Amino acid sequence: MIASVVTRFAPSPTGFLHIGGARTALFNWLYARKHGGKMLLRIEDTDRARSTTAAIEAILDGLKWLGIDWDDDVVYQFSRVARHRDIAEQLLAEGKAYRCYATPEELAEMREKARAEGRAKLYDGRWRDRDPSEAPPDLKPTIRLKAPLSGETVIEDQVQGRVVWQNENLDDLVLLRGDGTPTYMLAVVVDDHDMGVTHIIRGDDHLINAARQKQIYDTLGWALPTMAHIPLIHGPDGSKLSKRHGALGVDAYRAMGYLPAALRNYLVRLGWSHGDQEIFSTQEMIDAFDLSAIGRSAARFDFAKLENLNGHYIRNCDDHVLVDLFQDALDYVPRGADLKPKLNDATRAQLLRAMPGLKERAKTLIELIDSARFIFADRPLTLDAKAIPLLTSETRALIGRLRTTLETVTSWSAQTTEAAMRTFAEQNNLKLGAIAQPLRIALTGRTTSPGIFDVLAVLGKETCLARLDDQSSP
């Protein structure tokens, strides 16, 4: 076991917890839990104009829903601005940073010139060794790091391998803006150091930041945490992930009826593998997870695969647990609020009895809820478009005769109603399917449902006879 592992998840509260962020949080959580360490949560809210309380709540709620818990109190980066500023001033006093008085116009000119010449280095270092007495009046300076001018900056990344940057291509990055606020680069380094972070696991879009941050670590004489830059998530065609491909917030997946355990399982396999195993319990994930098994190439998001996995979790879920998930989902899924007032002890018991048949067909909680609507339906039932043309006068007459037969069943169950219907079919020279479909339409308003005899048993004799009355003709 690695001693005292501390990971962190550090989202910016400028929007929802997106699917890539959720996977990053999961990887950090799994690594910390495997090694008996801590996963800390830091909200990087220094962008005051874009950070919102609603976004913070969405991030916290999304993590809780996914079952990703964090250790210690949440750290809010903005509350540590004074500490960040002190470090910048310390570097300035030690001659490791300097005040830069370049005007916005000068900086724009430098950038254009660098791009025209094909240089990565945008700032020309003009204030690095210049006498501050030459500073223009009334211009608030930035504080820049005195980055090394030659040599290499090297990261031994746990996923990307050895990554090397030539220092001549890296300019003196800004640590403190003219208004006294710290830059992201400085704040992240100071916070990770002060929080005791030992492992930084994040998206590989941060890899260039790693070079800048290592220079700050080196200048301060602080130990660099172990870094692991994980591949981004792409769409199924290899393009940048879009909303159409799954670039949605965790809250959207909740509203689409995915189970948190299924989404966790799906996310862990995006970029990480453990042989051919696809299904993992939470403990199996923790036991097996390792940074060395994360690939370098972008993972591809596949909605169909997620849906199939979700269906597996629904089918294998305990019925009582699934009823609880069903109830919780009513607050989030489309039209869920319509059913909420109708969920009482009686309908909950019916739902529990129906669950073995319902869950076999459902790939999402939305499908599960939709297929269970017959339990909660008001009389007379509203027939769906496919059912209406099948309810002919002959069919209605048949339903009336079926109702008369079912009324004679004394001990109501799936078995007794099936026996009565089979006897009716034989006596009238009918196939069972010719009876089942009219029954299904009359009892559920649809052409598809769980097994018709399960439907009869779940609804009970009184409700079934009443619904058959509504759709029958003498």
Swiss-Prot record:
It is found in: Cytoplasm. Pfam families: Anticodon_2, tRNA-synt_1c. A motif ('HIGH' region) lies at residues 11-21. ATP binds at residue 243. The keyword Membrane does not apply. A motif ('KMSKS' region) lies at residues 240-244. Signal peptide: none annotated. Keywords: Aminoacyl-tRNA synthetase, ATP-binding, Cytoplasm, Ligase, Nucleotide-binding, Protein biosynthesis. It is an enzyme of class 6 (ligase). Catalyzes the attachment of glutamate to tRNA(Glu) in a two-step reaction: glutamate is first activated by ATP to form Glu-AMP and then transferred to the acceptor end of tRNA(Glu). This is Glutamate--tRNA ligase. The lineage of its organism: Bacteria, Pseudomonadati, Pseudomonadota, Alphaproteobacteria, Hyphomicrobiales.
